[in-house]
Amino acid sequence: MPQDQLPLAPDFAREVIDVPVADEMSESFLAYSLSVITSRAIPDVRDGLKPVQRRILYSMLNMGIRPDGPHRKCARVVGDTMGNFHPHGDSAIYDALVRMGQDFAKNVTLIDPQGNFGSLDEPPAAHRYTECRLTNAAMSMLGELDENTVTFRPTYDGESTEPVYLPGLLPNLLVNGTSGIAVGMATSMAPHNLACLLYTSPSPRDATLSRMPSSA
């Protein structure tokens, strides 16, 4: 390439600051690990959902895919979630959607599946073949979002907002359990029977409820 067609050199900083490698590695690793923990891998204790799961449910709510309506193509849900809320691969979004609809993977499913959602031995069909809609349990997680019950934050492109966590009438973290592997941290929590949870504390007092994570 001729010299006059080469791209201009970037405008580097005029001052070079010496930083010990150990300090830079420690600081950069901490920032990266916190990003992975809070943005992808570890569920939020307030609703028991990872960001991708929460964004799928919120996207379906916005699309009007409710329990009393028809099923819609999973491909539409994956595309809307990826375009508006979760700028990552479609396979990761679809895997999370499918798992929320598998009754052998969840005590209480949040997705009502239609089509081949897989089994213990076989993977699900491609998202262009399967359909889904929210369950009543999912609606209990999403209820009262429009009543200033939770904090909202801007989406990745700043064009809209999304809930930081869901109101969560259903104790999803306890009922469905959770698992996640992040950078330097992992979590695994077994599911619990909903009837047992209700029997354990059938009439909690206001003081008890105020200390629960979802009230933070």
Indicate residue ranges for each PLM-predicted region.
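Positively charged, low-complexity/disordered segments
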Residues: 203-206, 210-216
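Catalytic phosphate-handling regions of large nucleic-acid enzymes and associated NTPases
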Residues: 1-201, 205
